[in-house]
Amino acid sequence: MYRSCVVRARKRTCVEPWVIGIISFLSLIVLAVCIGLTVHYVRYNHRRTYNYYSTLSFTSDKLYSEFGREASKNFTEMSQRIETMVKHAFHKSPLRGQLVKAHIIKFSKEDDGVLAHMLLIFRIRSTEDPETVHKIIEYVLHEKLKYATGPPNVDPESVKIKKINKTESDNYFNHCCGTRRNKSTVQTSVRIVGGTPVEEEEWPWQSSLRWDGSHRCGATLINNTWLVTAAHCFRTHKDPSRWSATFGATLQPRKLTTGIRRIIVHEKYKYPSHDYDIALAELSKPVPCTNAVHKVCLPDANHEFQPGQRMFVTGFGALKNDGFTQNNLRQVQVDYIDTQTCNQPQSYNGAITPRMLCAGFLKGEKDACQGDSGGPLVTADVRDIWYLAGVVSWGDECGQPNKPGVYTRVTAFRHWIASNTGI
């Protein structure tokens, strides 16, 4: 049996105007409160960057000559110790979590010790009074460093800080070797062979060497007047006046262009051998240090890399064997491969000399390629400072299994570089 559907007429209800008014009023109050809370939250949590230049005196059981040279192993160790002391001081302070970076830029000798020059960068709520912030920073450094355990032994009373602007802060950073201001893609594993372009300012020491205006090789800026590159780049093209160097993440447009005054090819390089494949190019004029253009660090001659250590190689080279030069700079993450492994019969069968190093993967795929020659292979230390480990030299095609990229080992030529450039 079907049930019939009963339809009842709805009684229309009228709402009094005063009720509508109350509802509208309450809605406006709720909306105003929400807007106020949002504005307060944004304003309270908006942070302003504070840059400071700081100095502090310290004494050490090491001689200044042992750690005073930028980028040396002892310089890195001393810098890390002092930076760690400063970070710990702020960790137990009202500014906990607001110190973004403490970075030693240099040491200078004093009569009764050593002066550390340091940059401090904070991200602090914009509601805080700048004068109050300055006083808190001074107080923390003066009081908390009293409890820092050395070595080195810092003098908290010697601490001085000076507020500087972003331009000044960038200028200090850019005169330090191996610093990178833009690192948005450093964690990605992309390839030069089939990879994606990097962003401007990511690898500021990368240079393009051009013969009559056309890209021929990569190179690496090691100070404002010298490039390191591969000797084979100049095998048939030796006239410095026809060479130029450009900087930036694209071949066109160029960020900066300068001429080449002098080329120094290692005296033991003899083609077709790949040994001693290193050269220096002196720029016709010093290049200014900016976020987009500045030098990499050079490792000590006795520095040793560890198997599996992460490195990056960059260049404008081809995406595949016998391919074309790319307009955009590319990067690839590779691993350091020890010489014994690289000299196995299935790899290079003893061809790797003490002046070479291998980096890549035995499974292939990720590698440098034609047009990348002379470019940098770099690795970072514990302070996130980047060092030139190798110079793109040679390999068996590009990205082939058991045929990793072969690079000129920079540590093997550290004294040669110093004798020719003073660096």
Swiss-Prot record:
Glycosylation sites: 74, 165, 182, 223
A GO MF term: serine-type endopeptidase activity
Stretches of the chain found on the membrane's Cytoplasmic side: 1-18
Top-rank EC class of the record's enzyme: hydrolase
EC number: 3.4.21.-
Bilayer-spanning residue ranges: 19-39
S-S bonds: 176-297, 217-233, 342-358, 369-398
Keywords: Cell membrane, Disulfide bond, Glycoprotein, Hydrolase, Membrane, Protease, Secreted, Serine protease, Signal-anchor, Transmembrane, Transmembrane helix, Zymogen
Active-site residue numbers: 232, 277, 373
Family: Belongs to the peptidase S1 family.
Function of the molecule: Serine protease which possesses both gelatinolytic and caseinolytic activities. Shows a preference for Arg in the P1 position.
Protein's name according to its UniProt entry: Transmembrane protease serine 11E
